[in-house]
Amino acid sequence: MVPGGNSGSGRVPTSRRSFVKGLGAAGAVLPAVGLLPRRGLAEDAPPADAAAIDWKQFAGQTIALSGAIHPWSNAIAPLLPEFTILTGINVSIDFQLETTYLGALPIRLARGSSTPDVFMFTTYGQGITNGWLEPLNGYFSQRSLTDPAWYDESDLLKTARAFPLWSDGERYAVPITSEAMTLFINKEALAAKDQPLPQTFEELLVTARAVKTNGMSGIAMRAQAGGNSSPPAMGFVFSYGGAMVEHNRVVFASPEAIAAVEMYGQLLSQAGPAGVGSYEWYHVLDDFLQGRTAMAIDSSNFATDISNPAKSRVAKQAGFAIFPHLAGRGPVPFMSHWQACINSKSRNKRAAFLFLLWATSKATSLRTAAAGLATTRVSAWSSEGFKTAFGSEAAEAALTNLQNADVDRAKAILFHPQSRLILDAFMIGVNEVVNGAKSAKDAMTGAAERANAAIRG
């Protein structure tokens, strides 16, 4: 569904014309999202051996790649043997559950370990402030490592170009995915209760209550008391007009944020699954795949699994829609780019950079997009392979949610040096509300006070 439109079925436009128009509108309405390049929508891209780069210059080296079990790691892993054939560089991989990975990686980096050489990362401010991340501008400017015409940064979504930039213009990461919080619906479950697609938060609550049964929750979202569970709830805060941090102070105890968390708690306490206070993203996804929840809000990247009949019992009745909004306001879902970084202590930095260049190139992105990965490239997003694997309706919803997102508010928290501490405090408060331990006002006021005290030291 396009912004401002009404659709009883909840479907979004899926024609090629409307899809391409959405790409352009994303760039026009939100400057951080890319316009289509003038040369058109090529379904192929120059192969790696067409680049003016000596891919074999680090043959024999081995780089360690670490990350979360995630659509990106699932898509890139099968292609790694091709990278080794191209470069002679071996890649050892270590992918873990996201919560486990994000908890262990900072400890490893803080100890000064030279591995992993390349890693998926989210707490950029912490990594940059502590010197864990290698600055990359110099690598992009070295002609022995980069062929600018072949890599073609103009093909990147504008968010992907702007997102990794630190305040001094240096970049310490390369974006590898694009995602925004998206509403997933089981159309049959809603139709059985004669419920239309909810558009506002109040409508979402009414619908979630109406469709909840003994065997199916009305809605599932993350509520675990840890920062990794924060993206859906942050979208509620942003959509109510709140923010996470402003001027180096935690502000999620504002009236707007408190109202947002109160609604989040009502949804999950009144219509959520049993035990939702322990839910992480994989619990949410599994409930939706198995038909145990009528609705869910989480990453747009779930679409690949949801639309896959081999993994999903609801593939044929699944719908994808824009993030809900407060009456009188537009939706502001949380968005982010997972990024990959080079360890500043790595002994194989140049080989690691070649890997990042290859992994995010046009040719590789077309391959991963055909597997359903929402990459950072316009050419990949507009490819038929991506729309087939990801689903046209899901792609349209994801683009609309990216368009509606506020990149600055997302970066303000993600790039804060103590983002992990802040996000943990936030979700402890949200969890207290969901579990009924405290009111939203008491929980968020206390959480904000603790976080601000910790920031001040």
Q: Language-model segments: what does each one mean?
A:
Residues R161-I176, M181, E202-V250, E256, ...:
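Extracytoplasmic/periplasmic solute-binding protein
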